[in-house]
Amino acid sequence: METKFESYTMTIYLLAQVFSAIGALCVAISSFAKSKNNMLVWQITDYIFTAIANLLLGGYTGALTISISIIRNSLMVKKKMTKTILTILIIIQIIVGTYLNQLGIIGYLPIISSVSYSLAIATTPNLQWLRWVIIENMLLWLIYDLTIQA
């Protein structure tokens, strides 16, 4: 017979899986976007669902990285991103992500993914290049997500 705690844990796990699936759908849609802004907006939607899933599953490094990515993409969409702000966001991700990391090398994968995408999104208007960077990021996130069971 299942205890209340086991039932609660399973409910949280299943809810996190639903949020992860919705996020995955949004990132897939973003890869077909016709403009950089549209791509960024779909990614923000993905990040919101994925951050919630990471928090539910104890993936704090991932949730932090995603939260900063929401800020980054929002500033990009509003055309308010500067090199200084981008540098500050990257430094915050590295420092706080390292502090919150409880998974060793695996915990650094979201940080690496986000920093590489931050640099790519800031330096190229080429959507095809950004799609390739998204694939690289998805591979890093896949390893992280499998570890936290997202």
Name each model feature, range by range:
Residues E2-A150:
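Alpha-helical membrane-protein topology signature
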